[in-house]
From Swiss-Prot:
Annotated EC: 2.7.11.1
Entry keywords, A to Z: ATP-binding, Kinase, Nucleotide-binding, Serine/threonine-protein kinase, Transferase
Residue ranges constituting the Protein kinase domain according to the UniProt record: 47-194
Alphabetized GO MF terms: ATP binding; protein serine kinase activity; protein serine/threonine kinase activity
InterPro entries in alphabetical order: Kinase-like_dom_sf (IPR011009), Prot_kinase_dom (IPR000719), Protein_kinase_ATP_BS (IPR017441), Ser/Thr_Kinases-Pseudokinases (IPR051681)
Protein name: Serine/threonine-protein kinase mos
Organism in which the protein naturally occurs: Atheris squamigera (Variable bush viper)
A Pfam family assignment: Pkinase
Superkingdom: Eukaryota
Length: 194
């Protein structure tokens, strides 16, 4: 019988701390990205968090500057109630890093180690898509944060039929691409569409 030794993007196959890996003695566990994602490790000296954009069940998203460019930084928190789900969410999001499409946010860098905060499962730096979400466009709501220097540039009028068709086309194009890669977006809502 043969063993499939291809790289795995999930850390779930690794032994727990102190356990043996394929019968080999104690090996120090180093949290790192799989080889196919090594290109995207974070240069921490070049990252400057500006302010919180929002937070959800698995973490928080910040506006930041990375190598002089405006980016979004997602810090995936360790979930004490559902650690497995938070790990799977982090690694599933990193699997998208290899993809490139105009309607899918590009991942710039990522790390499973966070120097400033040990309660973080990992950090993902993504291209910054702006503050204005489809939710803001539909409902004409104001700022994502109370930070007036980072105002939204949304048209607070009614969403026209032409605009709705453009948004729908872009959403469907992005989803069709993800589905062609066997990836399903599990949190699709107007607040997550930029």
């Amino acid at each position: 019988s043969s063993v499939n030794a291809r790289p795995c993007s999930s850390p779930l196959v690794c032994p727990a701390k102190g356990e043996n890996f394929f019968g080999v003695g104690n090996v120090a566990r180093i949290r790192r990205l799989p080889p196919h994602l090594a290109w995207c490790s974070i240069d921490w000296d070049q990252l400057c968090l500006l302010h919180l954009l929002g937070s959800g069940g698995f973490g928080s998203v910040y506006k930041a500057i990375y190598h002089g460019a405006t980016v979004a930084v997602k810090k995936v928190k360790r979930c004490s109630k559902n650690h497995l789900a938070s790990r799977q969410s982090f690694w599933a999001e990193l699997n998208v890093a290899r993809l490139g499409h105009n309607n899918v946010v590009r991942i710039v860098a990522a790390s499973t180690c966070t120097p400033a905060s040990q309660d973080s499962l990992g950090t993902i730096i993504m291209e910054y898509a702006g503050n204005c979400t489809l939710h803001h466009v539909i409902y004409g709501t104001g700022y994502l944060t109370g930070n007036n220097s980072d105002s939204l540039k949304c048209d607070h009028g009614f969403l026209s039929t032409a605009q709705a068709v453009i948004y729908s086309h872009d959403i469907v194009a992005g989803l069709m691409f993800l589905h062609s890669q066997l990836i399903v977006h599990l949190d699709l809502k107007p607040a997550n569409i930029f």
